[in-house]
Structures are given as C-alpha cells and as structure tokens.
C-alpha cells in the first residue's frame, strides 16, 4: 500500500514527483528545479532520500 505524498504547507499532491524519482530515476536536484513552491521543495529535500522512504508501509494493528 502506497500513501500519497502531500505537502503539509500547501496541500499539493507530490505523487508525480515521487514517480519521477522512483520510476524514471531522475536525480533529486533535477526534480527540485522543476518545483515552483518553496514549501514543496523543502519537503522533498528534507524528508525524501532518493530510492528510499518513497513508500510508506502502514503499521500493523496488533489489537
């Protein structure tokens, strides 16, 4: 299960950006150049490592 990547500041869906990083294997610096909103660029630069942490696995309910 993959959750949508959403900017917490502006609410923009960043799933297309995640697709470019993961599937098209573009560099993070190249992808950041195409983003116009500074808050989205900051989120990607600080919370995503390329090819890692791009999918979020849901926690298992142990109850």
From Swiss-Prot:
InterPro entries: RNA_pol_7kDa_chordopoxvir. GO terms for cellular component: DNA-directed RNA polymerase complex; virion component. It comes from the Viruses. Its EC number is 2.7.7.6. One of its GO terms (molecular function) is DNA binding. It is an enzyme of class 2 (transferase). Part of the DNA-dependent RNA polymerase which catalyzes the transcription of viral DNA into RNA using the four ribonucleoside triphosphates as substrates. Responsible for the transcription of early, intermediate and late genes. DNA-dependent RNA polymerase associates with the early transcription factor (ETF) thereby allowing the early genes transcription. Late transcription, and probably also intermediate transcription, require newly synthesized RNA polymerase. This is DNA-directed RNA polymerase 7 kDa subunit. It comes from Molluscum contagiosum virus subtype 1 (MOCV). The lineage of its organism: Viruses, Varidnaviria, Bamfordvirae, Nucleocytoviricota, Pokkesviricetes.
